[in-house]
From Swiss-Prot:
It comes from the Eukaryota. It holds the Pfam family Glyco_transf_8. This is Probable galacturonosyltransferase-like 5. It is a single-pass type II membrane protein.
Length: 361
């Protein structure tokens, strides 16, 4: 359990920095998505960065008490924990750090199967992943064709929210093998600081997805005035208790998803959006329209979200109260960009130990 001591040290250091900084402030979930800043160019991803320069990850082995995979070491092995993450050249450093964090904190790392979603076949990301994690055998690359969803995407408040790969999670039930009945979907801008199997074992009851919910958020802000004033739409949530949830951390029952054809339901709302303009925030609102009020609640410890803040100089996010199992830099600010720019937020120091980029910090 050496990682507990290591994490505690980083955690304590970050908290001390938070207490000493008068400029830290909190943002609502909506603000974390919408925020922008006058220094944006300083934090833009560098398209020509040498993303092949990653250190090789050490080998992570299962503890003795882990269930044996037996002869079946393929994706259909019932003892596997399935995790889906996108691979994009601009966020690749974040994705690799996320994988590294999961392996470091898992008691049974060899029982975790990673499903990587890519939207380009020309960047050879599979070779990069395999060279960075040479001992990781439980992985597969899935090509998500941008044209699958391109015609359904509407303009958003941030161009980054319009990228087709943001919508790949809508198609996990189609992309992954039919034998995969459940999957954890994770964004690329987070690290896991607890055993992922605890999240995997979350009970969903009769629900199709599970996620931490935030019922204090002003739910009406996620849709336009036209949506709420139109009789065709304003009854959508009737009989439901809709709450905001962040789609960057979800446990998904793929069997139910396939059974009830939720991909088609999401696509229907995206088609309406193209004509009616009922929301502004990219891939999140269609999920809210379909699932809000029908989500199995998961402990907030599994999504300490909004840590990206808005990159305004001297303005950073604090942690929510309570225990922490997952740190999520949602919002426009990413820890690797701030660290490289020598303008980090205190909590970015908790991301840095999982960074495998050779020439960082």
């Amino acid at each position: 359990m050496h990682w507990i001591t290591r994490f505690s040290a980083f955690f304590s250091a970050a908290l001390a920095m938070i207490l000493l900084s008068p400029s830290l402030q909190s943002f609502s979930p909506a603000a974390a998505i919408r925020s922008s800043h006058p220094y944006a160019d300083e934090f833009k991803p560098q398209q020509n960065s040498d993303y092949s320069s990653f250190r090789e990850s050490p080998m992570f082995r299962n503890a003795e008490q882990c269930r044996s995979s037996g002869e079946d070491s393929g994706v259909c092995n019932p003892n596997l924990v399935h995790v889906a993450i996108t691979l994009d050249i601009d966020y690749l450093r974040g994705s690799i750090a996320a994988v590294n964090s999961i392996l470091q904190h898992s008691m049974c790392p060899q029982s975790v199967f990673f499903h990587f979603l890519v939207s380009s076949e020309s960047q050879n990301l599979e070779s990069l992943i395999r060279s960075t994690f040479p001992k990781l055998t439980n992985l597969k690359i899935y090509y998500f064709a941008p044209e699958t969803v391109q015609s359904l995407i509407s303009s958003s408040v941030r161009q980054a929210l319009e990228q087709p790969l943001n919508y790949a999670r809508n198609y996990l039930a189609d992309l992954l093998e039919p034998c995969v009945k459940r999957v954890i979907y994770l964004d690329s801008d987070l690290v896991v600081v607890d055993d992922i199997v605890k999240l995997w074992k979350t009970g969903l009851g009769q629900r199709t997805i599970g996620a931490p919910e935030y019922c204090h958020a002003n739910f009406t802000k996620y849709f336009t005035g036209g949506f709420w004033s139109d009789k065709r739409f304003n009854g959508t949530f009737k009989g439901r208790n809709p709450c905001y949830f962040n789609t960057g951390v979800m446990v998904i029952d793929l069997k139910k998803w396939r059974q009830f054809r939720f991909t088609k339901r999401i696509e229907k709302w995206m088609e309406i959006q193209k004509i009616e303009r009922i929301y502004e925030l990219g891939s999140l609102p269609p999920f809210l329209l379909v699932f809000a009020g029908h989500v199995a609640p998961i402990s907030h410890r599994w999504n300490q979200h909004g840590l990206g803040g808005d990159n305004v100089r001297g303005s950073c996010r604090d942690l929510h109260s309570g225990p922490v199992s997952l740190l999520h830099w949602s919002g426009s600010g990413k820890p690797w960009l701030r660290l490289d720019s020598k303008l980090p937020c205190p909590l970015d120091t908790l991301w840095a130990p999982y960074d495998l980029y050779k020439h960082s910090h």
